[in-house]
Amino acid sequence: QLITPDDLHWRPSNLMKIPNADFLERTGSENLSARLWRLPPKSANTLHKHIRQEEFYFVLEGTGRMRVGEETLTVPKHGGVLVGPDQLRQVFNDTEADVLWLVVGAPEELEFLQGSKSTGMDLKLIYPTEPTQLPKELDGVQWPPKA
């Protein structure tokens, strides 16, 4: 199924307000996720992990910065990082230019996060620590911006 740039719906992420677009939301894919993330200067996405999903992070524009566990990585344009399910990870941007990431993950794991109707999703499974904490490289930065 062809997906064109016109098919993408860009929106801010829930917690960190990072612009992102889901390539596969209209395809019905049950096993794969693929999303673009455009990190503005001096921003970060959530610190999180997964239950069984591996993710491949690929930099399309700019120079990517990422923490995986205790390690901080610098990822050049057209470079990538494979992250296992149980590793804490966070992409961030400590530069003055936007950074565009393509993040592909499999298998999809939404069913593992679904709790009962009364309790909802168990977010501690993917956010074992404070998800909105910023990396030390962004000390003194206010992100997400106050509305």
Describe the predicted segments one by one:
Residues V68-G69, K77, F92-N93, F112-Q114:
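Short glycine-/acidic-enriched loop or helix-start segments at secondary-structure transitions
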Residues L82, E96-G115:
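A short hydrophobic beta-strand segment most commonly corresponding to one strand
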Residues T46-L47, M66-R67, V83, R89-T95, ...:
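Short beta-strand His + acidic residue motifs that chelate non-heme Fe in jelly-roll/DSBH
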Residues N31, L36-P40, K49-V68, V104-P107:
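Short, conserved beta-strand element in jelly-roll/cupin
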Residues E70-P85:
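Short acidic-glycine-tyrosine-enriched beta hairpin
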Residues S43, R52, E71, Q87-L88, ...:
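A generic "binding-loop/recognition-motif" signal
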Residues L24-T27, L36, N45-I51, F92-D94:
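Short histidine-centered beta-strand/loop micro-motifs
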Residues Q1-L32, T46, Q114-A147:
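A short, N-terminal "cap"/entry segment at the start of jelly-roll beta-barrel domains
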